[in-house]
Amino acid sequence: MDGGTFDIQPIGRFYGSNTTIRRPREITCFSYDAEHKFHLGDSSLRYYYTPRLPADLNRGFDTFQKLDDTADEHLDALLETIMALEKETGKRCEADIITWRGMMTKILTAPFDNLNGFEMNATCFQVGGENNLYKIQQKQIQENQRMPPGMASQDLMAYWGYKFETLCLLQQPWDPTPRAEIESREDLVVNNNAQYCSVVRTGIGSTRLIIGGEVDAVWDCKPDRKEDPINWVELKTSAEIRNDRDMIKYERKLLKFWAQSFLLGVPKIIVGFRDNHGIVHRLEELETASIPNKVKKLGRGTWDGNICINFAAAFLEWLKSTIKEGGTWRIRKLEKSSLIQVFKIEETGTGDIISRSFLDWRSRS
């Protein structure tokens, strides 16, 4: 039988040992513009500058230019960018796994996220993840949720996050930006089509990874030398913490915040704490590397970053030994289940995971 099952439990077996981690380093990047058109390069790079507080995140909701995320993009933009880099350098980008950051976040957080499930497809050209099916399912679940009386809608709460980003970003570094531009950010139309996507080379245990993912902003400027780390900033919003229950909810959020930033090598996260009406009253700066220790020693200890990393290393090693031949494979974890199933859904081909242009390029190079 093709495939197999990996049990996350008992997680105690992932405790203690220190997995070797290769620091994520950006090897290339790409951008989507305001119409979500793909471009090589950093044209959509944005710069962080502190927003004015209090900040009303509801403002402009009626003019929100929202990305249509129903389109099936697979790995096309990521593979296009890797192909351009290989043509430029004359060297192949070697990796065991090429995927989006969102897919790896689900795997990394799985030991402490029993409630949520995921599905992704993979193929053995190099193992590659694609997240369209999962996104469609997630959207349906959100639409069917009934919000408690007095709570903002899911759409409005999603908008709050994008509004917060708009209030925190500049199109160029602070120094040459006119004061009027900085102070008029509250009036900008929010558009989440434009994105800067970093492509990094990293490693967890013996698995070499190339991961692509959106980055919100840079703290200062990108360094001239590619070897130097980049002072990326991830922007998040969260409800004010009023009691112990809120603290546990926030800690669980921190797991995702940490995993997303850890995978791309983002050193700093800025959280805007908002009330139930969508008004941000305070900011908190978090160092990504210190979050697991903070949760362990100062919080309720709801998760352990070391266990996440050790689990990811073991699971990816198992995945490589399970998916060793062509065809399309499904990687699936059901909600409230500790089992990750891997099974073949198509005997041959790559199931549209890998673009024709990339297949042609690799067969020639």
From Swiss-Prot:
Keywords: Hydrolase, Metal-binding, mRNA processing, Nuclease, Nucleotide-binding, Nucleus, RNA-binding. Its EC number is 3.6.1.-. InterPro entries: RAI1, RAI1-like_fam. A divalent metal cation binds at E165, D216, E234, L235. One of its GO terms (molecular function) is RNA NAD+-cap (NAD+-forming) hydrolase activity. Substrate binds at C197, E214, K236, Q260. One of its GO terms (biological process) is cleavage in ITS2 between 5.8S rRNA and LSU-rRNA of tricistronic rRNA transcript (SSU-rRNA, 5.8S rRNA, LSU-rRNA). GO terms for cellular component: cytosol; Las1 complex; nucleus; RNA polymerase II termination complex. The keyword Cell wall biogenesis/degradation does not apply. It is an enzyme of class 3 (hydrolase). The keyword Nuclease applies. It holds the Pfam family RAI1. It catalyses: a 5'-end NAD(+)-phospho-ribonucleoside in mRNA + H2O = a 5'-end phospho-ribonucleoside in mRNA + NAD(+) + H(+); a 5'-end (N(7)-methyl 5'-triphosphoguanosine)-ribonucleoside-ribonucleotide in mRNA + H2O = a (N(7)-methyl 5'-triphosphoguanosine)-nucleoside + a 5'-end phospho-ribonucleoside in mRNA + H(+); a 5'-end triphospho-ribonucleoside in mRNA + H2O = a 5'-end phospho-ribonucleoside in mRNA + diphosphate + H(+). Its cofactor is a divalent metal cation. It is found in: Nucleus. Its main location: nucleus. It comes from the Eukaryota. Divalent metal cation. Interacts with rat1; the interaction is direct, stabilizes rat1 protein structure and stimulates its exoribonuclease activity. The interaction also stimulates rai1 pyrophosphohydrolase activity, probably by recruiting it to mRNA substrates. Decapping enzyme for NAD-capped RNAs: specifically hydrolyzes the nicotinamide adenine dinucleotide (NAD) cap from a subset of RNAs by removing the entire NAD moiety from the 5'-end of an NAD-capped RNA. The NAD-cap is present at the 5'-end of some RNAs and snoRNAs. In contrast to the canonical 5'-end N7 methylguanosine (m7G) cap, the NAD cap promotes mRNA decay. Also acts as a non-canonical decapping enzyme that removes the entire cap structure of m7G capped or incompletely capped RNAs. Belongs to the DXO/Dom3Z family. This is Decapping nuclease RAI1. It comes from Aspergillus fumigatus (strain ATCC MYA-4609 / CBS 101355 / FGSC A1100 / Af293) (Neosartorya fumigata).
